[in-house]
């Protein structure tokens, strides 16, 4: 139902994302039925954001210059009431990334945060083993998502072998993930953009089903993609 709604609206979705995944993200959103834009200049954002249904801030390509861009984009989005998704790439990998992410969370309006377990744990002062953008799997992902939702005060999505969605002090688990996903770069980054495309459809009465729809759909797609690009094509 929500996929049909999205496709009928063809929502403009602005993605300020990392250099590695821009083409992958744009094509993924086009396949979904959204209209992607990779705008990276404040004056351009001022023109586009009034017509935008969702904004993604992905901190993968992090510099002092992109940090200023994130802040400008969030300020403009808040002015026009555009909901925002934050993907705090490798927030637990070092002090600089954590500082930038916490600055965005504490001084700007973020509608939803999506990350792996290590990234989300870092945002609430907890520690999970990480290596760059990759995070160790944990058994209690739902409990972590719930703690993050309670501390940050916004919906939290943790993705991995098990996905957890925490909203309004409640949590749901989706077991659609795959251990193969880390073998294909950019799948989590694309999901952040997918959530940004869907976010305008979410309201208090339908929050759970809205997020279950894109996450479940995306998990089924990327499971097949990961398997096709890894296991099936490996030589004997």
From Swiss-Prot:
GO function terms (MF aspect) = ATP binding; hydroxyethylthiazole kinase activity; magnesium ion binding
- Pfam families (UniProt xref): HK
**Functional pathway:** Cofactor biosynthesis; thiamine diphosphate biosynthesis; 4-methyl-5-(2-phosphoethyl)-thiazole from 5-(2-hydroxyethyl)-4-methylthiazole: step 1/1
Among the GO biological process terms of this entry, one is: thiamine diphosphate biosynthetic process
Q: Which CDD domains match?
A: THZ_kinase
Q: Tell me its cofactors.
A: Mg(2+)
> What residues bind ATP, as annotated?
114, 159
**Which UniProt keyword terms apply here?**
ATP-binding, Kinase, Magnesium, Metal-binding, Nucleotide-binding, Thiamine biosynthesis, Transferase
EC number from the UniProt entry: 2.7.1.50
Q: What reaction is this protein's catalytic activity?
A: 5-(2-hydroxyethyl)-4-methylthiazole + ATP = 4-methyl-5-(2-phosphooxyethyl)-thiazole + ADP + H(+)
Q: Where does substrate bind?
A: 38, 186
Similarity comment text for this entry: Belongs to the Thz kinase family.
Q: Which HAMAP family match?
A: Thz_kinase
Q: What does this protein do?
A: Catalyzes the phosphorylation of the hydroxyl group of 4-methyl-5-beta-hydroxyethylthiazole (THZ).
What is the name listed in the Swiss-Prot or TrEMBL entry for this protein? Hydroxyethylthiazole kinase
Q: Which organism is it from?
A: Streptococcus suis (strain 98HAH33)
UniProt lineage: Bacteria, Bacillati, Bacillota, Bacilli, Lactobacillales
**Gene name of the record:** thiM
